Amino acid sequence: GTYEVWNRFLAPNTFWHAEKRKFLRIGVSPLSNQGKLEWHTEIKNGTQYFSINKVENIDIIEENVLAIVDEAKKQGVDILVMPEMLGSYHIRKSVADKLSEFPENDESYPALTVLPSIWEAHQNTVIVLDEYGDEVIRQEKQHPFMLKNSEEGNCLENINPDRKIHLIHCEGIGRIAIMVCKDALMKDYLHMVLTVLKVTLLIIPSFSTGNYNFKEIIQYCRVADCCAFWINTCSVAITMGLDDKKLKNIGFALKAGKRPNDPNMENGLFLCERKSQGCENCGIAGCNQCMFIHDLVFGKGG
């Protein structure tokens, strides 16, 4: 199929912190294990569809999101990424209000904040805000997810994609694109984004029971010299009735390109591993401020 490409050009000094310190700091957060999705199903033309009614505990999620934004500011994160499905327009407003205030102590909010996607009116939308709380892009999910073996049998996500791909261009970084969960698993679509649109930084917010599919993406991105960040959420467990101990890897960072070697990087791939006693980076019961930080060194070919 055909897609319309929308280009958004950021000011050349958007990532001035990163340029000064010679690396880009990316924070990915699974947010919470408390975001339970409530949905309903309907049958149209012989196909069963599901639609999201609401996220239960949305107030807890909102607190988490605001705490993560604060943590990202303290840690000097340039791009903050959150998972799929757990967002709302109210959260978008709360975050925008927070970003619009001047931070203290010479700190800065992330240059880009990728909010948890919002499922509303048959659209699954990721909104990206700049450090002042202004909207950069809205990327809609283009490929519906098939919910398998739910109580009602297989159900297809009831979305009406807009067939638009938003590219964020920035000097020194290249082209940034967002692929919402299933979008990244569609080989033709991924191939087009990597080889035709020549994206250099791919962000994949997710709400998924398995990470096995996402490993295929790594090979594609590596060949295309594209860095990729995938983040899932621990809330999958409560929604899908899973034992959350089975969610071992909750995200990954792929640092592609010819970069200085980093001792923490195995083949340029870093897995965000959950620890069974709680999340690795905070140790707070109820995992309110979990964030994995990855630094991308500006290198030759990077």
Please give the residue ranges for each predicted region.
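Active-site catalytic loop in hydrolytic enzyme cores
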Residues: 1-21, 120-197, 216-217, 278-293, ...
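N-terminal, active-site-proximal structural segment of metallo-dependent hydrolase catalytic domains
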Residues: 1-77, 86
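Residues that mark the start of a beta-strand
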Residues: 22-27, 174-175, 225
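A structural signal for short, well-ordered beta-strand segments and their strand-loop junctions
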Residues: 28, 82, 113-116, 128, ...
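CN hydrolase (nitrilase-like) catalytic-core segments centered on the catalytic cysteine
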Residues: 78-79, 86, 93-113, 119-120, ...
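Short, well-ordered beta-to-alpha junction loops that form the rim of enzyme active sites
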Residues: 84-85, 181
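C-terminal, beta-strand-rich globular interaction domains
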Residues: 108-114, 135, 147
